[in-house]
Protein backbone atom coordinates (compact mmCIF):
# COMPACT_ATOMS: atom_id res chain seq x y z
CA UNK A 1 0.00 0.00 0.00
CA UNK A 2 2.87 2.35 0.83
CA UNK A 3 4.52 1.66 -2.52
CA UNK A 4 1.23 2.39 -4.30
CA UNK A 5 0.88 5.74 -2.54
CA UNK A 6 4.48 6.66 -3.36
CA UNK A 7 3.96 5.59 -6.95
CA UNK A 8 0.86 7.74 -7.35
CA UNK A 9 2.63 10.64 -5.66
CA UNK A 10 5.50 10.32 -8.12
CA UNK A 11 3.06 10.24 -11.03
CA UNK A 12 1.31 13.32 -9.71
CA UNK A 13 4.59 15.23 -9.40
CA UNK A 14 5.77 14.16 -12.85
CA UNK A 15 2.45 15.20 -14.41
CA UNK A 16 2.45 18.67 -12.81
CA UNK A 17 3.85 20.44 -15.93
CA UNK A 18 1.16 18.91 -18.15
CA UNK A 19 -1.60 19.84 -15.73
CA UNK A 20 -0.32 23.41 -15.53
CA UNK A 21 -0.17 23.59 -19.31
CA UNK A 22 -3.72 22.25 -19.53
CA UNK A 23 -4.98 24.99 -17.22
CA UNK A 24 -3.28 27.69 -19.29
CA UNK A 25 -4.63 26.12 -22.49
CA UNK A 26 -8.18 26.00 -21.13
CA UNK A 27 -7.95 29.67 -20.09
CA UNK A 28 -6.77 30.57 -23.61
CA UNK A 29 -9.71 28.60 -25.04
CA UNK A 30 -12.11 30.58 -22.89
CA UNK A 31 -10.62 33.86 -24.11
CA UNK A 32 -10.90 32.65 -27.70
CA UNK A 33 -14.53 31.64 -27.14
CA UNK A 34 -15.41 35.13 -25.88
CA UNK A 35 -13.61 36.71 -28.86
CA UNK A 36 -15.41 34.54 -31.40
CA UNK A 37 -18.85 34.91 -29.86
CA UNK A 38 -18.96 38.56 -28.82
CA UNK A 39 -16.19 40.34 -30.77
CA UNK A 40 -16.30 38.60 -34.20
CA UNK A 41 -12.89 37.03 -33.66
CA UNK A 42 -11.20 40.29 -32.67
CA UNK A 43 -9.59 41.18 -29.39
CA UNK A 44 -11.79 41.76 -26.37
CA UNK A 45 -12.70 45.43 -26.22
CA UNK A 46 -11.76 46.10 -29.86
CA UNK A 47 -15.21 47.29 -30.96
CA UNK A 48 -17.70 49.69 -29.51
CA UNK A 49 -20.88 47.65 -29.90
CA UNK A 50 -21.14 46.92 -26.19
CA UNK A 51 -22.08 49.23 -23.37
CA UNK A 52 -19.72 50.49 -20.72
CA UNK A 53 -20.79 48.00 -18.06
CA UNK A 54 -20.66 45.08 -20.49
CA UNK A 55 -17.20 46.06 -21.70
CA UNK A 56 -15.99 46.37 -18.12
CA UNK A 57 -17.38 42.92 -17.38
CA UNK A 58 -15.48 41.45 -20.34
CA UNK A 59 -12.31 43.20 -19.17
CA UNK A 60 -12.67 41.57 -15.73
CA UNK A 61 -13.05 38.18 -17.40
CA UNK A 62 -10.03 38.88 -19.59
CA UNK A 63 -7.81 39.87 -16.67
CA UNK A 64 -8.88 36.80 -14.75
CA UNK A 65 -8.05 34.44 -17.62
CA UNK A 66 -4.74 36.18 -18.40
CA UNK A 67 -3.74 35.91 -14.75
CA UNK A 68 -4.64 32.22 -14.83
CA UNK A 69 -2.46 31.78 -17.92
CA UNK A 70 0.49 33.60 -16.33
CA UNK A 71 0.28 31.58 -13.10
CA UNK A 72 -0.13 28.28 -14.94
CA UNK A 73 2.77 28.96 -17.30
CA UNK A 74 4.96 29.98 -14.35
CA UNK A 75 4.08 26.69 -12.66
CA UNK A 76 4.76 24.89 -15.94
CA UNK A 77 8.24 26.39 -16.24
CA UNK A 78 9.09 25.83 -12.57
CA UNK A 79 7.88 22.21 -12.47
CA UNK A 80 9.58 21.38 -15.77
CA UNK A 81 12.92 21.74 -14.01
CA UNK A 82 12.14 18.76 -11.75
CA UNK A 83 10.05 16.68 -14.15
CA UNK A 84 10.92 15.26 -17.52
CA UNK A 85 8.60 16.43 -20.26
CA UNK A 86 7.44 14.05 -23.00
CA UNK A 87 8.11 14.57 -26.69
CA UNK A 88 6.75 18.01 -27.67
CA UNK A 89 5.00 16.43 -30.66
CA UNK A 90 3.21 13.86 -28.50
CA UNK A 91 -0.14 14.20 -26.79
CA UNK A 92 -0.04 16.95 -24.15
CA UNK A 93 -2.80 15.74 -21.86
CA UNK A 94 -2.40 15.17 -18.17
CA UNK A 95 -3.06 11.86 -16.39
CA UNK A 96 -6.57 10.53 -15.92
CA UNK A 97 -6.66 11.25 -12.20
CA UNK A 98 -5.95 14.94 -12.71
CA UNK A 99 -9.13 16.91 -12.18
CA UNK A 100 -7.78 20.40 -12.94
CA UNK A 101 -8.76 20.18 -16.56
CA UNK A 102 -12.24 18.96 -15.77
CA UNK A 103 -12.69 21.79 -13.31
CA UNK A 104 -11.57 24.28 -15.93
CA UNK A 105 -14.15 22.92 -18.35
CA UNK A 106 -16.91 23.34 -15.81
CA UNK A 107 -15.95 26.90 -14.88
CA UNK A 108 -17.95 29.72 -16.51
CA UNK A 109 -16.06 31.64 -19.18
CA UNK A 110 -18.20 34.70 -19.54
CA UNK A 111 -21.79 35.78 -19.58
CA UNK A 112 -22.82 32.38 -21.02
CA UNK A 113 -21.91 28.98 -19.60
CA UNK A 114 -21.58 27.37 -23.05
CA UNK A 115 -18.94 29.72 -24.46
CA UNK A 116 -16.02 27.39 -23.72
CA UNK A 117 -17.80 24.34 -25.11
CA UNK A 118 -18.13 25.91 -28.56
CA UNK A 119 -14.39 26.48 -28.70
CA UNK A 120 -13.62 22.93 -27.57
CA UNK A 121 -15.81 21.12 -30.13
CA UNK A 122 -13.17 21.53 -32.80
CA UNK A 123 -10.50 19.73 -30.80
CA UNK A 124 -12.46 16.74 -29.50
CA UNK A 125 -11.21 14.48 -32.30
CA UNK A 126 -7.51 14.97 -31.44
CA UNK A 127 -5.89 16.35 -28.31
CA UNK A 128 -3.21 18.89 -29.34
CA UNK A 129 0.43 18.38 -28.54
CA UNK A 130 2.52 20.45 -26.15
CA UNK A 131 3.90 22.67 -28.91
CA UNK A 132 0.45 23.23 -30.38
CA UNK A 133 -0.90 24.27 -26.98
CA UNK A 134 1.99 26.66 -26.37
CA UNK A 135 1.61 28.16 -29.85
CA UNK A 136 -2.12 28.59 -29.32
CA UNK A 137 -1.54 30.27 -25.94
CA UNK A 138 1.04 32.64 -27.46
CA UNK A 139 -1.32 33.43 -30.33
CA UNK A 140 -4.19 34.33 -27.99
CA UNK A 141 -2.15 36.33 -25.46
CA UNK A 142 0.01 38.18 -28.00
CA UNK A 143 -2.69 40.70 -28.83
CA UNK A 144 -3.05 41.66 -25.15
CA UNK A 145 0.64 42.32 -24.55
CA UNK A 146 2.11 45.74 -25.13
CA UNK A 147 4.70 45.80 -27.92
CA UNK A 148 8.27 46.37 -26.92
CA UNK A 149 9.53 49.90 -27.26
CA UNK A 150 11.39 50.59 -30.51
CA UNK A 151 15.09 51.34 -29.95
CA UNK A 152 15.99 54.90 -30.67
CA UNK A 153 18.93 55.75 -32.81
CA UNK A 154 21.67 57.69 -31.07
CA UNK A 155 22.80 59.48 -34.23
CA UNK A 156 20.73 62.48 -35.30
CA UNK A 157 18.97 62.22 -38.68
CA UNK A 158 20.29 64.19 -41.64
CA UNK A 159 18.99 67.69 -41.98
CA UNK A 160 17.54 66.93 -45.40
CA UNK A 161 15.29 64.25 -43.90
CA UNK A 162 14.04 66.30 -40.96
CA UNK A 163 10.35 67.14 -41.12
CA UNK A 164 8.51 69.69 -39.03
CA UNK A 165 6.66 68.03 -36.17
CA UNK A 166 2.87 68.29 -36.45
CA UNK A 167 1.20 70.40 -33.84
CA UNK A 168 -1.52 67.81 -33.19
CA UNK A 169 0.83 65.00 -32.18
CA UNK A 170 3.59 64.76 -29.62
CA UNK A 171 5.42 61.91 -31.43
CA UNK A 172 6.67 61.66 -35.04
CA UNK A 173 4.70 59.38 -37.32
CA UNK A 174 6.70 56.27 -38.28
CA UNK A 175 7.43 55.86 -41.96
CA UNK A 176 7.57 52.05 -41.90
CA UNK A 177 4.12 50.64 -42.87
CA UNK A 178 4.60 47.65 -40.55
CA UNK A 179 5.16 49.94 -37.60
CA UNK A 180 2.03 51.88 -38.54
CA UNK A 181 0.06 48.64 -38.61
CA UNK A 182 1.40 47.60 -35.21
CA UNK A 183 0.59 50.98 -33.73
CA UNK A 184 -2.93 50.87 -35.13
CA UNK A 185 -3.42 47.40 -33.72
CA UNK A 186 -2.07 48.51 -30.36
CA UNK A 187 -4.46 51.46 -30.27
CA UNK A 188 -7.31 49.14 -31.19
CA UNK A 189 -6.48 46.66 -28.45
CA UNK A 190 -6.11 49.41 -25.87
CA UNK A 191 -9.53 50.91 -26.56
CA UNK A 192 -10.51 50.22 -22.96
CA UNK A 193 -8.02 52.82 -21.69
CA UNK A 194 -9.40 55.89 -19.90
CA UNK A 195 -11.10 58.33 -22.24
CA UNK A 196 -9.26 61.26 -20.73
CA UNK A 197 -5.95 59.86 -22.04
CA UNK A 198 -7.06 60.09 -25.70
CA UNK A 199 -7.35 63.12 -27.93
CA UNK A 200 -10.07 63.69 -30.50
CA UNK A 201 -10.79 66.29 -33.15
CA UNK A 202 -14.45 66.55 -32.15
CA UNK A 203 -15.96 66.75 -28.67
CA UNK A 204 -16.42 63.31 -27.21
CA UNK A 205 -20.07 63.99 -26.43
CA UNK A 206 -20.78 64.32 -30.16
CA UNK A 207 -18.94 61.09 -30.89
CA UNK A 208 -20.80 59.28 -28.11
CA UNK A 209 -24.13 60.59 -29.41
CA UNK A 210 -23.33 59.48 -32.95
CA UNK A 211 -22.23 56.08 -31.69
CA UNK A 212 -25.45 55.77 -29.67
CA UNK A 213 -27.57 56.61 -32.72
CA UNK A 214 -25.64 54.07 -34.80
CA UNK A 215 -26.21 51.39 -32.19
CA UNK A 216 -29.93 52.16 -31.96
CA UNK A 217 -30.34 51.95 -35.75
CA UNK A 218 -28.39 48.70 -35.96
CA UNK A 219 -30.27 45.51 -36.82
CA UNK A 220 -28.80 43.87 -33.72
CA UNK A 221 -29.82 46.66 -31.34
CA UNK A 222 -32.45 44.60 -29.54
CA UNK A 223 -30.13 41.63 -29.14
CA UNK A 224 -27.31 43.85 -27.86
CA UNK A 225 -29.67 45.60 -25.45
CA UNK A 226 -30.92 42.27 -24.14
CA UNK A 227 -27.37 40.97 -23.80
CA UNK A 228 -26.31 44.11 -21.96
CA UNK A 229 -29.29 43.80 -19.62
CA UNK A 230 -28.42 40.18 -18.88
CA UNK A 231 -24.81 41.12 -18.22
CA UNK A 232 -25.91 43.96 -15.93
CA UNK A 233 -28.25 41.64 -14.05
CA UNK A 234 -25.47 39.08 -13.64
CA UNK A 235 -23.11 41.72 -12.27
CA UNK A 236 -25.76 42.97 -9.84
CA UNK A 237 -26.44 39.44 -8.59
CA UNK A 238 -22.71 38.83 -8.15
CA UNK A 239 -22.27 42.11 -6.23
CA UNK A 240 -25.27 41.56 -3.93
CA UNK A 241 -24.36 37.93 -3.30
CA UNK A 242 -20.75 38.81 -2.46
CA UNK A 243 -21.86 41.67 -0.19
CA UNK A 244 -24.22 39.37 1.71
CA UNK A 245 -21.49 36.76 1.90
CA UNK A 246 -19.08 39.28 3.44
CA UNK A 247 -21.68 40.27 6.02
CA UNK A 248 -23.25 36.91 6.90
CA UNK A 249 -20.47 34.33 6.69
CA UNK A 250 -18.05 35.94 9.23
CA UNK A 251 -20.99 36.55 11.57
CA UNK A 252 -22.10 32.91 11.38
CA UNK A 253 -18.52 31.74 11.88
CA UNK A 254 -18.21 33.95 14.97
CA UNK A 255 -21.45 32.67 16.50
CA UNK A 256 -20.95 28.97 15.80
CA UNK A 257 -17.25 28.93 16.70
CA UNK A 258 -17.97 30.67 20.01
CA UNK A 259 -20.75 28.32 21.11
CA UNK A 260 -19.60 25.02 19.60
CA UNK A 261 -15.80 25.26 19.33
CA UNK A 262 -14.16 27.73 21.69
CA UNK A 263 -16.94 27.71 24.30
CA UNK A 264 -16.61 24.02 25.29
CA UNK A 265 -12.83 24.24 24.93
CA UNK A 266 -12.50 27.19 27.34
CA UNK A 267 -15.08 25.78 29.78
CA UNK A 268 -13.08 22.58 29.95
CA UNK A 269 -10.15 24.44 31.52
CA UNK A 270 -12.34 26.42 33.92
CA UNK A 271 -11.62 25.62 37.61
CA UNK A 272 -14.31 23.52 39.22
CA UNK A 273 -14.38 25.67 42.35
CA UNK A 274 -13.91 29.30 41.28
CA UNK A 275 -13.13 32.00 43.80
CA UNK A 276 -14.07 35.64 43.96
CA UNK A 277 -10.41 36.59 43.52
CA UNK A 278 -10.35 34.97 40.06
CA UNK A 279 -12.88 37.50 38.78
CA UNK A 280 -11.96 40.82 37.27
CA UNK A 281 -12.40 43.95 39.36
CA UNK A 282 -15.49 45.01 37.40
CA UNK A 283 -17.18 41.63 37.85
CA UNK A 284 -16.30 41.63 41.55
CA UNK A 285 -18.06 44.98 41.95
CA UNK A 286 -21.13 43.74 40.09
CA UNK A 287 -21.29 40.49 42.09
CA UNK A 288 -20.93 42.26 45.44
CA UNK A 289 -23.46 44.92 44.46
CA UNK A 290 -26.00 42.28 43.44
CA UNK A 291 -25.34 40.31 46.64
CA UNK A 292 -25.83 43.42 48.81
CA UNK A 293 -29.07 44.17 47.02
CA UNK A 294 -30.32 40.63 47.63
CA UNK A 295 -29.36 40.83 51.33
CA UNK A 296 -31.08 44.17 51.82
CA UNK A 297 -34.14 42.80 50.08
CA UNK A 298 -34.37 39.93 52.62
CA UNK A 299 -33.95 42.36 55.53
CA UNK A 300 -36.64 44.60 54.10
CA UNK A 301 -39.07 41.69 53.80
CA UNK A 302 -38.36 40.63 57.42
CA UNK A 303 -38.98 44.18 58.59
CA UNK A 304 -42.31 44.25 56.78
CA UNK A 305 -43.40 41.10 58.63
CA UNK A 306 -42.25 42.52 61.99
CA UNK A 307 -39.59 39.87 62.35
CA UNK A 308 -36.26 40.18 64.09
CA UNK A 309 -33.66 42.05 61.99
CA UNK A 310 -31.18 39.29 62.75
CA UNK A 311 -31.05 36.66 60.00
CA UNK A 312 -32.23 33.18 60.82
CA UNK A 313 -30.89 29.93 59.41
CA UNK A 314 -33.27 30.01 56.45
CA UNK A 315 -32.17 33.50 55.42
CA UNK A 316 -28.51 32.60 55.82
CA UNK A 317 -29.08 29.55 53.63
CA UNK A 318 -30.65 31.77 50.97
CA UNK A 319 -27.68 34.14 51.09
CA UNK A 320 -25.24 31.24 50.78
CA UNK A 321 -27.03 29.87 47.70
CA UNK A 322 -27.19 33.35 46.18
CA UNK A 323 -23.44 33.85 46.70
CA UNK A 324 -22.65 30.54 44.97
CA UNK A 325 -25.02 31.42 42.14
CA UNK A 326 -23.40 34.83 41.62
CA UNK A 327 -19.92 33.32 41.73
CA UNK A 328 -20.79 30.76 39.04
CA UNK A 329 -22.55 33.39 36.96
CA UNK A 330 -19.71 35.89 36.89
CA UNK A 331 -17.10 33.16 36.51
CA UNK A 332 -18.76 32.20 33.23
CA UNK A 333 -18.96 35.85 32.20
CA UNK A 334 -15.30 36.26 33.08
CA UNK A 335 -14.45 33.71 30.37
CA UNK A 336 -16.84 35.18 27.79
CA UNK A 337 -14.22 37.73 26.77
CA UNK A 338 -11.70 35.02 25.88
CA UNK A 339 -14.32 33.14 23.88
CA UNK A 340 -15.29 36.31 22.02
CA UNK A 341 -11.66 37.16 21.22
CA UNK A 342 -10.97 33.71 19.77
CA UNK A 343 -14.21 33.71 17.77
CA UNK A 344 -13.57 37.26 16.50
CA UNK A 345 -10.07 36.34 15.32
CA UNK A 346 -11.45 33.36 13.40
CA UNK A 347 -14.20 35.46 11.81
CA UNK A 348 -11.62 38.09 10.77
CA UNK A 349 -9.53 35.35 9.16
CA UNK A 350 -12.59 34.17 7.25
CA UNK A 351 -13.32 37.75 6.17
CA UNK A 352 -9.74 38.21 4.98
CA UNK A 353 -9.92 34.90 3.12
CA UNK A 354 -13.08 36.05 1.33
CA UNK A 355 -11.37 39.30 0.34
CA UNK A 356 -8.32 37.40 -0.90
CA UNK A 357 -10.17 34.93 -3.11
CA UNK A 358 -12.82 37.39 -4.29
CA UNK A 359 -10.77 40.04 -6.06
CA UNK A 360 -12.90 39.85 -9.20
CA UNK A 361 -16.08 40.03 -7.12
CA UNK A 362 -14.66 43.07 -5.32
CA UNK A 363 -14.22 44.86 -8.64
CA UNK A 364 -17.80 44.03 -9.57
CA UNK A 365 -18.96 45.21 -6.13
CA UNK A 366 -17.06 48.50 -6.49
CA UNK A 367 -18.68 49.05 -9.88
CA UNK A 368 -22.10 48.28 -8.40
CA UNK A 369 -21.59 50.69 -5.48
CA UNK A 370 -20.30 53.43 -7.81
CA UNK A 371 -23.36 53.04 -10.01
CA UNK A 372 -25.62 53.04 -6.96
CA UNK A 373 -24.06 56.10 -5.33
CA UNK A 374 -23.67 58.17 -8.50
CA UNK A 375 -27.27 57.38 -9.38
CA UNK A 376 -28.48 59.28 -6.33
CA UNK A 377 -29.57 62.87 -6.60
CA UNK A 378 -27.47 65.69 -5.19
CA UNK A 379 -29.90 66.16 -2.30
CA UNK A 380 -29.70 62.47 -1.41
CA UNK A 381 -25.90 62.56 -1.49
CA UNK A 382 -25.83 65.64 0.73
CA UNK A 383 -28.33 64.03 3.12
CA UNK A 384 -26.20 60.90 3.48
CA UNK A 385 -23.04 62.95 4.07
CA UNK A 386 -24.73 65.09 6.74
CA UNK A 387 -26.18 61.98 8.40
CA UNK A 388 -22.80 60.27 8.64
CA UNK A 389 -20.97 63.37 9.84
CA UNK A 390 -23.58 64.12 12.52
CA UNK A 391 -23.62 60.53 13.76
CA UNK A 392 -19.84 60.14 14.04
CA UNK A 393 -18.56 63.68 14.63
CA UNK A 394 -21.69 65.67 15.48
CA UNK A 395 -22.84 67.28 18.71
CA UNK A 396 -24.41 64.10 20.13
CA UNK A 397 -21.69 61.74 18.90
CA UNK A 398 -19.74 61.55 22.25
CA UNK A 399 -22.62 59.68 23.86
CA UNK A 400 -22.69 57.19 21.02
CA UNK A 401 -18.91 56.70 21.15
CA UNK A 402 -19.10 56.14 24.91
CA UNK A 403 -21.76 53.44 24.53
CA UNK A 404 -19.83 51.84 21.67
CA UNK A 405 -16.53 51.70 23.56
CA UNK A 406 -18.19 50.42 26.73
CA UNK A 407 -19.91 47.66 24.77
CA UNK A 408 -16.65 46.78 23.02
CA UNK A 409 -14.81 46.52 26.34
CA UNK A 410 -17.54 44.28 27.76
CA UNK A 411 -17.45 42.13 24.61
CA UNK A 412 -13.70 41.59 24.91
CA UNK A 413 -13.84 41.07 28.67
CA UNK A 414 -11.74 44.16 29.41
CA UNK A 415 -12.29 46.53 32.33
CA UNK A 416 -14.00 49.77 31.42
CA UNK A 417 -11.36 52.50 31.60
CA UNK A 418 -13.11 55.86 31.73
CA UNK A 419 -9.91 57.84 31.14
CA UNK A 420 -9.21 55.94 27.93
CA UNK A 421 -12.81 56.38 26.75
CA UNK A 422 -12.82 60.13 27.37
CA UNK A 423 -9.40 60.53 25.73
CA UNK A 424 -10.56 58.57 22.69
CA UNK A 425 -13.72 60.66 22.38
CA UNK A 426 -11.69 63.87 22.62
CA UNK A 427 -9.30 62.94 19.77
CA UNK A 428 -10.74 60.39 17.34
CA UNK A 429 -13.91 62.30 16.27
CA UNK A 430 -11.73 65.33 15.58
CA UNK A 431 -9.59 63.23 13.27
CA UNK A 432 -12.72 61.88 11.55
CA UNK A 433 -14.09 65.39 11.09
CA UNK A 434 -10.85 66.49 9.44
CA UNK A 435 -10.89 63.40 7.24
CA UNK A 436 -14.47 64.07 6.13
CA UNK A 437 -13.67 67.68 5.24
CA UNK A 438 -10.54 66.68 3.34
CA UNK A 439 -12.46 64.03 1.40
CA UNK A 440 -15.18 66.54 0.48
CA UNK A 441 -12.61 69.12 -0.61
CA UNK A 442 -10.25 66.75 -2.38
CA UNK A 443 -12.49 64.15 -4.00
CA UNK A 444 -16.18 65.02 -3.91
CA UNK A 445 -15.61 68.60 -5.02
CA UNK A 446 -14.00 67.25 -8.19
CA UNK A 447 -16.42 64.40 -8.86
CA UNK A 448 -19.74 66.07 -8.00
CA UNK A 449 -19.48 69.83 -7.41
CA UNK A 450 -23.27 70.18 -7.37
CA UNK A 451 -23.50 67.69 -4.48
CA UNK A 452 -20.95 69.75 -2.53
CA UNK A 453 -22.93 72.93 -3.16
CA UNK A 454 -26.12 71.20 -2.01
CA UNK A 455 -24.29 69.89 1.07
CA UNK A 456 -23.12 73.37 2.07
CA UNK A 457 -26.59 74.81 1.47
CA UNK A 458 -28.26 72.12 3.61
CA UNK A 459 -25.58 72.32 6.30
CA UNK A 460 -25.89 76.09 6.60
Curated annotation (Swiss-Prot):
> Main location per UniProt?
membrane
> How is this protein positioned relative to the membrane?
Multi-pass membrane protein
Instruction: Report biased composition (Polar residues) as residue ranges.
Output: 167-194
Superkingdom, taxonomy of origin: Bacteria
For this chain, one GO molecular function annotation is:
proton transmembrane transporter activity
Transmembrane spans: 242-262, 337-357, 373-393, 420-440
Q: Which InterPro entries match?
A: CemA (IPR004282)
Residues annotated as region Disordered? 84-194
Keywords annotated in UniProt: Cell inner membrane, Cell membrane, Hydrogen ion transport, Ion transport, Membrane, Transmembrane, Transmembrane helix, Transport
Q: Which Pfam families match?
A: CemA (PF03040)
* Record's GO cellular component terms: plasma membrane
Q: Where is the composition biased (Basic and acidic residues)?
A: 114-136
Compartment list: Cell inner membrane
Key word Acyltransferase present:
no
Q: What does this protein do?
A: Required for H(+) efflux immediately after light irradiation to form a rapid H(+) concentration gradient across the thylakoid membranes. Together with PxcL, contributes to transient H(+) uptake following dark to light transition.
Family of the protein in this entry: Belongs to the CemA family.
The name of this protein is Proton extrusion protein PxcA
Which species is the source of this protein? Synechococcus sp. (strain JA-3-3Ab)
